[in-house]
């Protein structure tokens, strides 16, 4: 490892954001260990070492954070039980989502604390990927949402158990900072999307699901199903921009929590139109019943601009173009 600048542990390295972070860290000269239940679905992991294991098992967490008897310089905690609206908002997976994700975070922090005590060091900086789902439902009833500020999180009332667990874990990470001096960074991700994200099977998020539905239509177009009236609004951030913002946060002295998102708000109907535009398909929308989530959610980026000098730069159309074409490649085998 002597030829590497730093060491990093990426938890959830088989997932969408984690696999992209592995690539970024390697490009910066890090030695990287990845850990996940599964290998990346769409490409080989580029991690120097990849451990397949279940982080809800404390013994796996304990082994994962140990870098040849020493602490990692940085840990990126993306591992969670999660999915899109069709997985999160039905209520059918609430117990698993809360139990599995909380167990992972409890195990990782306990393992880092114990390793610090054993080695008498405390150098590890840990990033935790929280979510815009922590924000209260009452602040997201307006589809013309002006943008959620970090201070809007309380009084707490997330609209899903996934959001409650994320909010609990934010507090968990900061409590380990206060009580044990573990350096933490927390970002609240707003709908990250892009190539190599899940695009079928029920856990995909809106951009991937809509790109797939439109790509499945003939060149002449057709009809796609949209949950609800399609007037619910969201903002979506392209994966490369998410990775850049996360790295800036880790390189800074600012702990967060901080929004990482786009301020370009669109309705789901408009998202369909953007996907249809890629191949100039004429697409009708068939509105059906389905899990919707909140009525309107958008990111307010004032804090991250102030603290990190970061802002999103890719228009939604550009990210959808790249994602649509990648999904079409997957469909064509």
Predicted feature residues:
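C-terminal substrate-binding subdomain of Rossmann-fold SDR/epimerase-dehydratase oxidoreductases
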Residues: 24, 107, 216-333
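Rossmann-fold cofactor-recognition segment
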Residues: 46-57
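Conserved Rossmann-fold NAD(P)-dependent oxidoreductase catalytic core, especially the SDR/UDP-sugar
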Residues: 106-159
